[in-house]
Curated annotation (Swiss-Prot):
Keywords: Chaperone, Cytoplasm, Nickel insertion. Belongs to the UreD family. UreD, UreF and UreG form a complex that acts as a GTP-hydrolysis-dependent molecular chaperone, activating the urease apoprotein by helping to assemble the nickel containing metallocenter of UreC. The UreE protein probably delivers the nickel. Pfam families: UreD. Required for maturation of urease via the functional incorporation of the urease nickel metallocenter. It is found in: Cytoplasm. GO terms for cellular component: cytoplasm. InterPro entries: UreD. This is Urease accessory protein UreD. GO terms for molecular function: nickel cation binding.
Length: 271
């Protein structure tokens, strides 16, 4: 099946820093030149969609391979804006492979789903038991002409993570505003925005999960965290402000980056 845009990156360790030893892009996806945001040698790549938004039937494929001991952050230049999709949903597929000791952080800007939008996102991660994977997502409803809170049709986000060839996590998020009860108990519970943070690392234990749960205890936000096989964890937060939820997810990232790698808080320098 043809795609609107494709991106492939292969990251390896070269001395005291990580570099791309192979990269390819086609269509409506690009990457800026690599940046090194701190003194750890971790490489950061910014994915760019020159079109500025995702339209009816668009499909995108991103593949990232992180080789032994290498470390990378993949982010976006700006929010992922999903416009009206009258015939076919927008698809975003991400596939990642992590070798022994590899680190990958997926830190995109928020997904904004506008009125009439349908969006399907799948992420497949295959990782060595000694690797580290972290990702965050923030979903924001776009403005609707009639002022409705949820104008989009459907958002589906599915993440599957395999550790050492074994399926460790399947996280399937499905939001359909047209179905009764989406704003109620067990769904968004009166809030408009949703954030999620996923981490898999052999060092995750019950004490760390408890510590992250305490980070989520903030006014105006409903948050919780659960331990998953891997070992790993998934944190969710409901709120009404993109900036606040993103900062909260980055608080979790900061704790883990400092604890595991002695690395500072991510400063993606976009604005």
């Amino acid at each position: 099946m043809s795609t609107t845009g494709e991106l492939y990156l292969r990251i390896a360790q070269d001395g005291d820093r990580s570099i791309a030893v192979d990269q390819y892009h086609r269509g409506a996806l690009r990457v800026f030149r690599p940046l090194y945001l701190d003194g750890t040698g971790q490489v950061a790549y910014y994915v760019v969609n020159p079109g500025g938004g995702y339209l009816d039937g668009d499909s995108y494929l991103t593949e990232v391979e992180v080789l032994q001991g290498a470390s990378a952050v993949l982010t976006t230049q700006a929010a992922t804006k999903i416009y009206r999709t009258p015939t076919r949903p927008v698809r975003q597929d991400t596939r990642a492979s992590l070798a022994p000791g590899a680190v990958l952080e997926l830190v995109p800007d928020q997904v904004i789903a506008y009125r009439g939008a349908s969006y399907r996102q799948t992420t497949l991660v295959e990782m060595d038991p000694t690797a580290t994977f972290m990702s965050l997502e923030v979903l924001t409803p776009g403005w609707a002409p009639d002022g409705s809170a949820f104008g989009y049709d459907c958002v589906r986000m599915r993440t599957e993570i395999r550790v050492g060839g074994r399926c460790a996590v399947v996280d399937n998020l499905r939001l359909v505003p047209g179905e009764a009860g989406m704003a109620g108990l067990g769904a968004l519970e009166g809030h408009s925005h949703l954030a999620s943070f996923t981490a898999l690392d052999a060092r995750i234990d019950a004490a760390l999960v408890t510590e992250i749960g305490e980070l989520l205890e903030v006014d105006g936000v409903r948050g919780a965290v659960t331990r998953v096989p891997g070992p790993g964890l998934i944190a969710r937060a409901l709120g009404d402000d993109t900036t606040r939820l993103t900062a909260l997810m980055l608080d979790i990232s900061e704790l883990l980056r400092d604890r595991w790698f002695g690395a500072p808080r991510l400063d993606l320098r976009k604005y």
